[in-house]
Amino acid sequence: MIIASPADVALGLTELVAIDPRLEPLARRLAPLPLRLAEPGFAGLAHIIVSQMVSRASAEAIWGRIVAATGGPPAAEAYLALDAETVAGLGLSRAKASTLELAARAVASGSLDLSAIAALDEAEAIGRLTVFKGIGLWTAEVYLMFCGGHPDIFPAGDVALRAAVGDAFGHDARPDIRQVSEIAEAWRPWRSVAARLFWAHYAARTGREAAPAAE
């Protein structure tokens, strides 16, 4: 199945609480969880690339400039049509600008079919995305969650998720990627809903939205 509606998220949350009753207080306090679903394609991937390693506020500011420059959520061709001066003024790091150009060229040429990739199983889809320089595991996982509706992905490399899991379970220090991955195994086949839950917990505890944007 895929996560395609708020009802799917609600179902997943109910199932999660049955799987792991420790999540019940979080679920009761934080539901309903947001769907956060975008159409598969260049705009969704680009939004996630922009979100890499920066605050949500910074990412949204940069994204707003991209949308303004391209006249809407950017198609690959519209992004490639931007001149160098405009791209330089978007606020992107050199690495992100390079990644966006590489991805846009691949999409425009047909060598990267983001709709088809979103429909693949997790391992194959991640393998096809991460061959592109600048698209790592976190970016691929978030794309599949929020543009493909994959129900069972937990991006353990996400610092906010690790902090939220550690806080919820009383860890003295933020758990590492391996520890969080092991904890999240218990939440199959709804790890993507668990990720939404812990992003919501992080936002509630810190007052800062950390879930990556793809819409």
Q: Model segments located where?
A:
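Alpha-helical ds-nucleic-acid-binding substructure associated with the helix-hairpin-helix region
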Residues: 3, 22, 26, 54-133
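A broad detector of the eukaryotic-type serine/threonine protein kinase catalytic domain
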Residues: 50, 71, 84, 108, ...
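A positional/architectural concept
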Residues: 11, 18-48, 53, 57-70
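Flexible, active-site-adjacent loop/turn segments at secondary-structure boundaries
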Residues: 24, 31-33, 40-43, 52, ...
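A generic structural signal for residues located within well-ordered alpha-helices
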Residues: 45, 58, 95, 156-157
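Generic alpha-helical structural context detector
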Residues: 47, 51, 64, 68, ...
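C-terminal accessory module of base-excision DNA glycosylases/AP lyases that mediates lesion recognition
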Residues: 1-33, 98, 122-123, 137-215
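A general alpha-helix detector
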Residues: 44-49, 65, 82-86, 124-128, ...
